[in-house]
């Protein structure tokens, strides 16, 4: 639609960006993108994918590898409130421990977004839900251990992200 109706443009504003798929399509074409979403977790994800701040990608890979080996030793907020509901107890315990560890790394804002995005997407893979977080299954049948993956590092220039 855009290619058929707009001649030459350099900037695209996606003000209700949601998953970011449309904005990413234009980012891949070398356009400057402006994104907005009121949901804070989306802001974190967009900072990962569309942010301009330089990151040390090797450091991110190393930290995520370390986070995957986290062996929680005590209960935490996530295990107490979400264990055996939205997540298996062990996954909830590990999620909470990882989330706490992320706060202690010496990283810039975008690097922290990479770590949080990795955790958010890993949580989604092991969640005991049926489409959204208001509807979880009473029987815990999602027992796969949580595993964080390293988000792709996109080269971005002059993008703007709002919440």
Enumerate the predicted regions with their spans.
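Aromatic pocket-lining residues of Rossmann-like dinucleotide-binding sites
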Residues: 26
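Conserved alpha-helix/loop element of class I SAM-dependent methyltransferases that forms part
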Residues: 1-8
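Conserved class I S-adenosyl-L-methionine
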Residues: 8-18
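Conserved SAM-dependent methyltransferase scaffold
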Residues: 22-23
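Class I S-adenosyl-L-methionine-dependent methyltransferase module
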Residues: 32, 38-162
